[in-house]
Amino acid sequence: EATSNFVVGDITVSGGALSDFAAASSTVYTATFTPTADGAATIDVAPSTFTDASGNNNTAATQFNWTYDGTAPTMTITATDGSNAVSDGSTTNDATLTVTFTSSEATSNFVVGDITVSGGALNSFSATSSTVYTATFTPSASGATTIDVAANTFTDAAGNNNTAATQFNWTYDVTVPTISSVSLASDNS
């Protein structure tokens, strides 16, 4: 019903604040809700806060509830050579690495194409959960390799784009050491 005394103060909110309250008509009102942080938010109108033209008090509104998520997901890249961890920036002679990509939030659209590599190739990419993905990295030759996930390549359930992962750097070294010269300091014969 039409009302003329419904005001922004009749609305109770948690988890944010209302602004730009306006009457679009005598029965429709609009406002902008801005969350203060990630988490639960509610908007409510209690009973008997405004009246209709005949002076009848309103009944309680159905509370509007939802959870706000404005945090961008992050991705952590780690590697192992079987059961041993391989540190970022290290040098090894492992023919393959198992690379694990761990998202801070569940995602359903992280795919192998979101990953960039240099010095090798990824295969056997699979999801072990909605936050953990694995792949096998095979270097193409001795030398520096990188594995990276750029910003804005996947989203969380709320639609937030990811931040860039810290690049994983590893050097593959299968060069056999050689001795270039041998000299004797003295001859005892």
Say what each PLM segment does:
Residues 1-189:
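Non-catalytic beta-sheet/beta-sandwich ligand-binding modules that flank or precede catalytic cores
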